[in-house]
């Protein structure tokens, strides 16, 4: 790691927000994986594992919502670059460990000049919000939590994994 001082890249010298110029960066293969959870009641876990919730296929709808959201990231987050996304996978798992929840994991891939961490985070966030929407008739207390980047590969800064 360099000894040079670190700074926020989306802020110019005067403190104004700016979109980073990536035109001089190399086009490389890049991936990012993010995760998150929706804490739900035991009743919701039972419904998701069995007959389903009143609104329908909660996990299927959340998966598609996450994929769609990844593609909309630059529309939702002002300083994100529009990218050519090569692939998005969103996986949801109903679990009791360590507590009743829906675990969400999204991986986004591109070959471009900047990374896809924000796209992966957006996919997880919107998938989680969709789970809440799908189960709220049964569990108004559902909680979205623990959204974070797990890994990223490619680019000038190289690979990174959450310790």
UniProtKB/Swiss-Prot annotation:
Pathway membership, UniProt: Cofactor biosynthesis; molybdopterin biosynthesis
EC number: 4.6.1.17
Alphabetical UniProt keywords: Lyase, Molybdenum cofactor biosynthesis
Enzyme class: lyase
Domain of life (superkingdom): Bacteria
Pfam family of the protein (one): MoaC
Catalytic activity reported: (8S)-3',8-cyclo-7,8-dihydroguanosine 5'-triphosphate = cyclic pyranopterin phosphate + diphosphate
Active site: 133
GO MF annotations, alphabetized: cyclic pyranopterin monophosphate synthase activity
Keyword Lyase part of the UniProt annotation: yes
One biological process term in Gene Ontology: Mo-molybdopterin cofactor biosynthetic process
Residues reported to bind substrate: 79-81, 118-119
Record-linked NCBIfam families: moaC, PRK09364.1
Subunit structure, interactors included: Homohexamer; trimer of dimers.
PANTHER family: CYCLIC PYRANOPTERIN MONOPHOSPHATE SYNTHASE, MOLYBDOPTERIN COFACTOR SYNTHESIS PROTEIN A
Function: Catalyzes the conversion of (8S)-3',8-cyclo-7,8-dihydroguanosine 5'-triphosphate to cyclic pyranopterin monophosphate (cPMP).
Family, similarity comment: Belongs to the MoaC family.
The protein, known as: Cyclic pyranopterin monophosphate synthase
Lineage: Bacteria, Bacillati, Actinomycetota, Actinomycetes, Propionibacteriales
